[in-house]
């Protein structure tokens, strides 16, 4: 008690209980108690409940209100910055645990060349989106204005405790490449303008009305606020000027994603995507059966899918695909074979995948078929069985599962996949199964390092042998991996294996050093390498994707020609490191050290295989980092002469 009183006096400031904001008082109390003993979420709930009872507040203070009070005290210089308190109060910390925060924006309603029978077609929404979806609702409320959408989302993230200086911008809505060319360019320019000017905004909150909906269980928050200086905000005159400014902006776009259909993955569009600094494509694949695609009016073929993904690889893009189990004409065998096919066909093998189990919603042809008893919707048992089998038997360690279900409110779903927490339920059931069956768990873990070779760091690494179409060759520099101990992940994908909150801070002086793991597999362009730093159980800290193109599969653009290897992604799964100049933590040093180690290994493999250049499809602000590693900007790629 004496120690607590000491810290309370240390952090407290004189106040009049009749006039002081009670949330300020509560923040000071939380800081004081955390100084004595680190608080967890349960402790925080107890403190808030006791405080509300003592102060006779009408309800328990929400974390959003406390975060606002914290920032007010910080702004008034009455407290010092406290990372632990910010993390404790942060809403949905997982949104920034992968190292970035995602901002989704939607384009305006516009016709789509497809006539998919499962797609909703609301009059005032882009094709396939429903106005009650959280992201779509935010776009509709902001009249699909890209600047307003970004401002709104960044403000929401900031007020819920997330740093927004590293942003993955995701452009959704209809078939973007079918829109007029000027609109596509202006939309992207506006995204850069919004990020460049967000820090200049002057925001006024009416007292006592922080949010329209202040429930802590709500996914999205709409803030009542007024932007008082919008008329004085100056935007860039050109796209290139906006991109250049973003290199040093406080809120930087580190990745830009757009959606497309297979028939739009042309050389012309690939070049345009790079000029907009697009780094990732999401492609609607849906099925690997031509009869299923035709029955659902997709109006493209499996061969077009294969050719499109081949083209994306040639240009060095990172890509995601969408798969829809349960489409009209489905069987379990066809749905399962689709997953087997995409990870055995060298033309597919996606970096990322989204499961979108088919749902029956109104305003669709599929709904009419369902009403006529011509379509039998998926059951939850069917979906869980398929997910379970693909997790345990198919999904490889180099891919990432981004979603298991689409974010459509259950109230909008007439039949089919309508459990919004399907991912959580499936993961929990699989965890119980693996805990009770060690042999099955060991079988899953063994697929992490199938037929691996263990070498030491002194051995010259030369990887020249080709792989079979569905084979993964693994080389480990470090210690023998642990294939026995139970771990929390139930799938081998990179998202399941992120280090997240399980890690302890690490530096080069620690006894235990992560292994350097090199997984090689075959693609249609030629040889792919997934190079990562992992602990002995397979949890990922850092990774990169290296592509060695066949000499006959190269394109002549920006030094992407013969004898040029490609880095398609360099990613760090560590708590977001802020880009502020005054932050000088061990975390930042780790990022630079391990990033350079991954680059060094990619360069070594490239040189050993007689490649003369290494080209990186880099984010805008990362150019400075690559320049320090002796890379130069050539066209829209960073290139190093080996």
Q: Where are these predicted regions, by residue range?
A:
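Conserved GNAT acetyl-CoA-binding A-motif
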Residues: 605-618
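A conserved beta-strand-loop-helix scaffold within acyl/acetyltransferase catalytic domains
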Residues: 518-575
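Conserved active-site alpha-helix within GNAT-family acetyltransferase domains
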Residues: 618-637
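Flexible glycine/acidic-rich beta-alpha junction loops that bind and position SAM and/or redox cofactors
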Residues: 295, 325-333, 349-378, 397-427, ...
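Conserved non-cysteine loop/helix-boundary elements of the Radical SAM core domain that shape
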Residues: 132-149, 169-192, 204-320, 324-385
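Conserved acetyl-CoA-binding loop-helix of GNAT-fold acetyltransferases
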Residues: 583-605
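Flexible, acidic/Gly-rich N-terminal and inter-domain linker regions that tether
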Residues: 3-149, 153-231
């Amino acid at each position: 008690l004496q120690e607590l009183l000491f810290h309370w006096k240390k952090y407290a400031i004189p106040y009049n209980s009749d006039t002081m904001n009670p949330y300020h008082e509560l923040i000071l109390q939380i800081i004081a108690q955390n100084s004595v003993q680190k608080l967890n979420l349960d402790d925080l709930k107890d403190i808030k409940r006791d405080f509300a009872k003592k102060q006779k507040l009408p309800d328990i203070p929400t974390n959003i209100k406390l975060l606002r009070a914290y920032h007010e005290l910080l702004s008034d210089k009455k407290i010092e910055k406290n990372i632990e308190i910010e993390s404790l109060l942060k809403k949905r910390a997982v949104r920034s645990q992968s190292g970035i925060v995602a901002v989704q924006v939607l384009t305006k309603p516009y016709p789509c060349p497809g006539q998919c029978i499962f797609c909703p077609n609301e009059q005032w929404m882009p094709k396939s989106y429903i106005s009650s979806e959280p992201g779509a609702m935010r776009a509709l409320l902001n009249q699909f204005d890209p600047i307003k959408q970004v401002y709104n989302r960044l403000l929401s993230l900031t007020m819920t405790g997330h740093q927004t200086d590293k942003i993955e911008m995701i452009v959704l809505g209809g078939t973007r490449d079918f829109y007029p060319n000027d609109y596509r360019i202006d939309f992207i320019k506006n995204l850069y303008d919004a990020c460049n000017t967000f820090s200049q905004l002057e925001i006024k909150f009416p007292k006592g009305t922080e949010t329209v909906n202040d429930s802590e269980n709500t996914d999205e928050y709409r803030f009542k606020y007024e932007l008082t200086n919008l008329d004085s905000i100056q935007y860039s005159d050109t796209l290139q000027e906006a991109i250049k400014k973003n290199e040093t902006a406080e809120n930087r776009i580190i990745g830009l994603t757009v959606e497309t259909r297979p028939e739009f993955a042309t050389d012309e569009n690939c070049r345009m995507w790079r000029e907009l600094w697009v780094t990732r494509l999401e492609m609607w694949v849906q099925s690997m059966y031509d009869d299923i695609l035709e029955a659902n009016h997709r109006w493209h073929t499996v061969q077009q899918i294969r050719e499109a993904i081949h083209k994306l690889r040639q240009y060095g893009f990172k890509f995601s695909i969408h798969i829809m189990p349960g489409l009209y004409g489905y069987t379990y065998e066809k749905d399962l074979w689709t997953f087997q096919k995409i990870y055995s066909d060298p033309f597919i093998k996606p970096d990322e995948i989204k499961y979108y189990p088919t749902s029956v919603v109104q305003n669709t042809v599929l709904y009419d078929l369902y009403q006529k008893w011509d379509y039998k919707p998926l059951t939850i048992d069917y979906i869980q069985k398929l997910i379970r089998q693909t997790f345990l038997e198919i999904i490889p360690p180099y891919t990432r599962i981004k979603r298991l279900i689409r974010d459509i409110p259950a109230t909008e779903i007439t039949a089919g996949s309508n459990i919004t927490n399907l991912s959580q339920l499936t993961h929990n059931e699989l965890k119980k199964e693996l805990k009770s069956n060690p042999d099955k768990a060991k079988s899953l873990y063994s697929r992490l390092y199938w037929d691996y070779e263990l070498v030491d760091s002194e051995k010259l690494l030369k990887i020249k042998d080709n792989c079979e179409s569905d084979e993964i060759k693994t080389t480990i520099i470090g210690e023998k991996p642990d294939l026995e101990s139970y771990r929390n992940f139930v799938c081998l994908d990179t998202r399941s294996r992120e280090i997240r909150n399980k890690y302890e801070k690490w530096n080069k002086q620690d006894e235990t050093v992560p292994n350097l793991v090199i997984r090689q597999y075959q693609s249609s362009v030629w040889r792919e390498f997934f190079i990562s730093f992992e602990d002995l159980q397979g949890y990922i800290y850092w990774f990169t994707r290296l592509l060695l193109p066949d000499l006959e599969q190269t394109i002549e653009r920006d030094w992407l020609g013969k004898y040029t290897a490609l880095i398609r992604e360099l990613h760090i799964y560590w708590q977001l490191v802020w880009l502020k100049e005054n932050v000088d933590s061990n975390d930042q040093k780790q990022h630079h050290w391990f990033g350079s180690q991954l680059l060094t290994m990619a360069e070594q493999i490239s040189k050993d295989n007689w490649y003369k250049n290494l080209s990186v499809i880099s984010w805008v602000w990362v150019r400075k980092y690559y320049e320090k590693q002796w890379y130069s900007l050539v066209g829209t790629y960073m290139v190093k002469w080996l």
